[in-house]
């Protein structure tokens, strides 16, 4: 039997609950946490999808893992479980976060460096971006050893970079252009 699934309607419903209870920021933070947990532990969704395990046991696991979260956040996960929507829980959360990102004025930046950044370095970058944009900026990081040193920041379709690899590429282009001009 074919069942049509619309994760966006669940996301909007969760948003409405958050808005009615004046807890949009709290829900945003808590669903961000839930998203990280299910991304780091894909076996959790596999366990929750397993109909051979009693529903009560699966509810207990949700309460155990997410016990400190708002009741409505936990209940949203349980509703997805009962309605056989747990396999799209991540999509529901992503859609919800997109709605709340807009509502809360949150922007995103990707910081690519040659080595892992410390928490204090990330905080400095985030603070600088927050000040520059007058928005809340959430940062994701990536390590790219080809940079040799320095960084790239991708933010709002703009690229800011200061790294040796980029400098070497510019020098290379200048040298090649110079040789072509000599001919």
UniProtKB/Swiss-Prot annotation:
Q: List where in the cell it is found.
A: Cell membrane
One Pfam family hit: OSCP
Please state the protein's primary subcellular location.
membrane
List the cysteine pairs that form cystine.
none
Stored InterPro entries: ATP_synth_OSCP/delta_N_sf (IPR026015), ATPase_OSCP/dsu (IPR000711)
Q: Which GO terms describe its molecular function?
A: proton-transporting ATP synthase activity, rotational mechanism
GO CC, sorted alphabetically, is:
plasma membrane; proton-transporting ATP synthase complex
Question: Is this entry keyworded rRNA-binding?
Answer: no
Q: Which domain of life is it from?
A: Bacteria
Q: Report how it sits in the membrane.
A: Peripheral membrane protein
Q: Which keywords annotate this record?
A: ATP synthesis, Cell membrane, CF(1), Hydrogen ion transport, Ion transport, Membrane, Transport
> Which SUPFAM superfamilies does the record associate with it?
N-terminal domain of the delta subunit of the F1F0-ATP synthase
Function, as annotated: F(1)F(0) ATP synthase produces ATP from ADP in the presence of a proton or sodium gradient. F-type ATPases consist of two structural domains, F(1) containing the extramembraneous catalytic core and F(0) containing the membrane proton channel, linked together by a central stalk and a peripheral stalk. During catalysis, ATP synthesis in the catalytic domain of F(1) is coupled via a rotary mechanism of the central stalk subunits to proton translocation.
Classification via PANTHER family: ATP SYNTHASE DELTA CHAIN (PTHR11910)
Member of which family?
Belongs to the ATPase delta chain family.
HAMAP family from the entry? ATP_synth_delta_bact (MF_01416)
Quaternary structure note = F-type ATPases have 2 components, F(1) - the catalytic core - and F(0) - the membrane proton channel. F(1) has five subunits: alpha(3), beta(3), gamma(1), delta(1), epsilon(1). F(0) has three main subunits: a(1), b(2) and c(10-14). The alpha and beta chains form an alternating ring which encloses part of the gamma chain. F(1) is attached to F(0) by a central stalk formed by the gamma and epsilon chains, while a peripheral stalk is formed by the delta and b chains.
Protein name as it appears in the record:
ATP synthase subunit delta
Source organism per entry reads: Mycoplasmopsis synoviae (strain 53)
UniProt gene name: atpH
């Amino acid at each position: 039997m074919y069942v049509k699934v619309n994760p966006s309607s669940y996301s909007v419903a969760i948003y409405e609950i958050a808005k009615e209870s004046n807890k949009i920021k709290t829900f945003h933070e808590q669903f961000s946490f839930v998203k990280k947990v299910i991304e780091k532990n894909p076996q959790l969704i596999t366990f929750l999808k397993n109909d051979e395990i009693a529903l009560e046991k699966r509810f207990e696991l949700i309460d155990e893992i997410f016990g400190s979260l708002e009741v409505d956040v936990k209940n949203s996960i349980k509703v997805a479980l009962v309605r056989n929507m747990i396999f799209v829980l991540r999509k529901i959360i992503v859609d919800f976060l997109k709605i709340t990102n807009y509502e809360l004025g949150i922007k995103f930046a990707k910081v690519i460096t040659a080595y892992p950044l410390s928490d204090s370095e990330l905080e400095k970058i985030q603070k600088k971006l927050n000040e520059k944009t007058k928005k809340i900026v959430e940062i994701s990081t990536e390590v790219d050893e080809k940079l040799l040193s320095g960084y790239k920041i991708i933010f709002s379709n703009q690229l800011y970079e200061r790294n040796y690899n980029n400098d070497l590429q510019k020098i290379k282009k200048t040298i090649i252009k110079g040789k072509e001009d000599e001919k």
